[in-house]
A protein has these predicted regions:
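Active-site-proximal helix-loop-helix substrate-binding element of RNase H-like nuclease domains
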Residues: 5, 45-46, 50-163, 167-170, ...
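Short, flexible, glycine/charge-rich loop motifs used to bind or transfer phosphoryl groups or to couple energy/partner
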Residues: 14-16, 34, 65-68
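Short, glycine/acidic-rich hinge or "gate" loops at secondary-structure transitions
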Residues: 175-182
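Fold-independent oxyanion-binding glycine-rich loops
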Residues: 29-30, 81
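Short, surface-exposed beta-edge/turn micro-motifs
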Residues: 22, 40-41, 74-75
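An N-terminal structural lobe/cap that precedes and organizes the functional/catalytic core
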Residues: 30-49
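N-terminal accessory regions of nucleic-acid-interacting proteins
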Residues: 1-25, 29
Length: 199
């Protein structure tokens, strides 16, 4: 796994050079809690499926040029439960264009099947990937802010799989004639200009 923890302007620039060339990017955040109003944004993660970047916002590192990747409408940003991440990004003055939500896609695909749409269970169903969520409990208001290798790996473990998951889901949405329903459901939680432009 090619990992960059981007702390300097040069590292942000290096990440931008590579990620700005992507057509799709997995994106995620780590936060201190569930409420963007009262919680803190600790990090923003990006992955093209091979190159994985974590920006440690908790250390005072701004996204810099990477904010342009979020607003670039030619790049699809893939989130799992986009509304959660978008709330925290918005609270920190970052906007995002062209969004795909793997959780909404999974809910559309599994409607009536009594299956969880959590990322851990979804990735296990598709790829037999077993996500270790044990590190998640460390991200709270009392966290010391130190990004250990284990925390970096945990934070990036979600985003690395999102590009491949989106491809699989889009294939199934198309095969089952559910693409329009997915767009309709996505539109319910996102402003119209943020929906996935690849459909």
């Amino acid at each position: 796994m090619d990992i960059l923890v981007a702390r300097t302007g040069d590292e942000i620039g290096q990440a931008f050079e590579r990620l700005s060339q992507a057509q799709i990017l997995g994106c995620d955040t780590e936060t201190s809690g569930l409420s963007s109003r009262y919680g803190r944004l600790f990090s923003v993660q990006f992955s093209d499926g091979e190159f994985n970047v974590l920006v440690p916002v908790s250390e005072g590192v701004p996204l810099g040029q990477l904010a342009e990747v979020l607003t670039d409408a030619s790049i699809t940003k893939i989130f799992h439960n986009a509304k959660f991440d978008l709330d925290f990004l918005s609270e920190n003055c970052y906007s995002v264009e062209n969004i795909y939500d793997t959780m909404i896609a999974e809910k559309v695909l599994t409607r009536g099947a009594n299956q969880s749409a959590s990322l851990a269970e979804t990735l296990y169903r598709y790829f037999a990937v077993d996500l270790d969520k044990s590190q998640r409990a460390k991200f709270n208001r009392k966290w010391d802010g130190i990004w250990t290798d284990e925390l970096v790996d945990y934070a990036l473990s979600d985003v690395i799989h999102l590009p491949r998951l989106m491809a699989e889901q889009m294939t199934w949405l198309d095969k089952l004639g559910l693409s329009e329903e997915f767009e309709r459901q996505l539109g319910k939680i996102l402003p119209a200009n943020n929906a996935n432009k690849n459909e």
